[in-house]
Amino acid sequence: QRWLLAPEPVDQGFDRWFPLAPTWPERLQALGAAGIQRLVLLGGAQLSADLLQADCVDALQLTLVPQLLGGRFSWLPCTNAPLPAALAQPGAWQSEGVEDLGDGEWLVRYRRIRSG
């Protein structure tokens, strides 16, 4: 099924529409109430930054490739909005494994450690 989280519904292409709540915690709570237990974010610098700024990210899967990209290719936008200090604290993330994807590319998994 294809579900849409947006300010307004669209005429076609989606099986279900969720109104865009004011904050990410509220949006994720609405999705959870609908039975969504896991959401995968595949990209979008601003979306990634918004979810990190709201401290709504529970896991990271990063690929390391022997190629440096920056500027418009960065996965987080260059803004003045800081990320929560808790994300940079020792013990905020725990390594869950590394996988060799071949051709010098690695997938590194981290899980967010939350207190309480």
Question: Which residues does each predicted region cover?
Answer:
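Enzymes that bind and transform nitrogen-containing heteroaromatic metabolites
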Residues: 1-116
